[in-house]
Amino acid sequence: MSLFNKIVKEFQWGQHKVRLETGEIARQASGAVIVDIEDTVVLATVVGAKSAKPGQDFFPLTVDYIEKTYSAGKIPGGFFRREGRPSEHETLTSRLIDRPLRPLFPEGFYNEVQVVIHVLSVNPEIPADIPALIGASAALAVSGLPFNGPVGAARVAYVNNEYVLNPTREQIKASRLDLVVAGTERAVLMVESEADQLPEDVMLGAVVFGHEQMQTAIDAIHELVREGGKPEWDWQPAPKDEALNARVTELAQPELLAAYQIRDKQARSTKLKEVYAATSAKLEEEAVAAGTVAADKATVGNILFDLEAKIVRGQILNGEPRIDGRDTRTVRPIEIRTGVLPRTHGSALFTRGETQALVVATLGTKGDEQIIDALEGEYRERFMLHYNMPPFATGETGRVGSPKRREIGHGRLAKRALVACLPSADEFGYSIRVVSEITESNGSSSMASVCGGCLALMDAGVPMKAHVAGIAMGLILEGNKFAVLTDILGDEDHLGDMDFKVAGTADGVTALQMDIKIQGITKEIMQVALAQAKEGRMHILGKMKDAVAGANTQLSEFAPRMITIKINPEKIRDVIGKGGSVIRALTEETGTTIDISDDGVVTIASTNSEGMAEAKKRIENITAEIEVGHVYEGTVLKLLDFGAIVNLLPGKDGLLHISEIVNERVKDINDYLKEGQQVKVKVIQTDEKGRVRLSAKALLNEAAAQADTPPQQ
């Protein structure tokens, strides 16, 4: 009899065969599923605590996606030869998995849940993120935890005007769209995408296509649960204290209504804190007077939050002004300034209402490109975008240091939005780094980074294909009534049902990110949101074009200049030298940065034009071929009885025979030449062994012949 109760489900999904397994590996976890798609294999595990910690007032879900280097047949680098801190890709994939799972846990469920996905085997053509998301969903489904899933996921490409389900990496390279969508049987929960200026209807079509196709995976998970699922947890939410609810509402509602008439964020936040504190204090006072135990602050805080949401959502659905006084379609006031910082290569200050980004662009050489050692192989990134949001941006204190998951995710979204409009490496040979410093935040700071990033790039002289702008949309949905909000505030994001970010140009969408907190978002609602987002985007693009018509034609004086020359690939070793000695001396002596590609393209960069010209000249000399008939200014290296050895180019010498120095007979060569003397010579012969014969008297004869020729009338 086997130790294992192994359950396997296999199904065809588009062009791929998928295998789900449970019951053999990681049996002590609450749930564990292995997903295998064409040799990309992941193990997804879930462990849930049986009870919540005392005083817990939020849902502690953590998702960790971990890539093992052995999965690609590699040994990790570094001194310890083992996996270290999560890479940016692992962090982004962890967020991608977390986002559709989190909304499906019931309200009031505060038990700690940890989802861990290990990548065990990798087919370089099959990205591991979709198997990981399917695996996490399946592991939660079989675990018995209170989870309103399962979730399905799909990647969609757009090749030759057709949608492609779960494309290979080669297909993604040829695609104008890379979109990941996740959802349940009835609703879309999450979208993450990058596109090449595609129209809104194509983007929405991709979301709908992906949602339809993921049903195959959801059906397979249901079958796996029927045969191998654990008993469902007997979890019930804590009963609501209706009397406490009524008393909190009685005490706080008038004050909360007054707070939400305050348009300034800081003043409103201060008033809300006062309401929370006063309500808790009053309840404690009443409990002491009655000789009872006061309700804990977490419970009171949750009631107040629900009351806030009810007030704000009701006002918007009833057609009243939003928190800051706007209607649903108005974008906050925009201020733009470029060239903000004097010695950076490009900079812009983009302010939209109470959200502000100081964005800086820096140009570098090929040597500044980021080298990424991924499971599928090493590659280079010439465009980097980093997003930082310090605590002072929201008027708070907090930790300052390495970027958090949110900052990495926002930076990647802004990068996706801009990359489609960057010039190619052939058109603009620089590596580019953009840093967005969020100096104020009240909603949509990632989209401010897109706008500011585009402006900073143009200020740096990067020839962008078009202006790129981004906008964040929100949604309030109650029954059949809904309102789509343009350019949402932080509070509206917090209290609303959807965060929907769209970036693009006047011609189409370049990035789309959607996180939906509820079920019931229809295709029609998404159509309205996309149309309203386009309206807002076009407004912002107009403001950007008024401020900056196009890219600067001149680079900053502090940016490196570049020249490119082509050499014979066989000469690359001559330029590099033994152990890099020649190229090291070249860069140090000329103050330049030199990059050589395998095809013989040499890029020389420097802020000093004279040093760049000198480096170019020396490389051309090193790689030049000696040609018969050419005249060279050489240096006498050594005198012999029968002639002199003359250096023509670095590493290239020739023989000036004693009979080729002058026309008359030379008795003593020392009467005509000295070692170290500069001498002009002509190449008269080379042989198959590379030996070179030179002549000085040939030049004397040519000069005499020209002198004897009478001038033409």
UniProtKB/Swiss-Prot annotation:
Domain named S1 motif: residues: 629-697
Alphabetical UniProt keywords: Cytoplasm, Magnesium, Metal-binding, Nucleotidyltransferase, RNA-binding, Transferase
Keyword Phosphoprotein: no
UniProt-listed CDD domains: KH-I_PNPase, RNase_PH_PNPase_1, RNase_PH_PNPase_2, S1_PNPase
One GO MF term: RNA binding
Entry-linked InterPro entries: ExoRNase_PH_dom1, ExoRNase_PH_dom2, ExoRNase_PH_dom2_sf, KH_dom, KH_dom_type_1, KH_dom_type_1_sf, NA-bd_OB-fold, PNPase
Domain of life: Bacteria
GO cellular component terms given for this protein: cytosol
Catalytic activity: RNA(n+1) + phosphate = RNA(n) + a ribonucleoside 5'-diphosphate
Span of domain KH: 560-619
Entry cofactors: Mg(2+)
Binding site for Mg(2+): D493, D499
Main localization of the protein described in the UniProt heading: cytoplasm
EC number: 2.7.7.8
GO BP annotation list: mRNA catabolic process; RNA processing
Keyword Magnesium tagged: yes
PROSITE patterns: KH_TYPE_1, S1
Compartments where found: Cytoplasm
PANTHER family referenced in this protein's UniProt entry, alphabetically: POLYRIBONUCLEOTIDE NUCLEOTIDYLTRANSFERASE, POLYRIBONUCLEOTIDE NUCLEOTIDYLTRANSFERASE 1, MITOCHONDRIAL
Function of the protein: Involved in mRNA degradation. Catalyzes the phosphorolysis of single-stranded polyribonucleotides processively in the 3'- to 5'-direction.
HAMAP family: PNPase
Listed NCBIfam families: polynuc_phos (TIGR03591), PRK11824.1 (NF008805)
Record-stated family: Belongs to the polyribonucleotide nucleotidyltransferase family.
Protein name in UniProt: Polyribonucleotide nucleotidyltransferase
Gene label: pnp
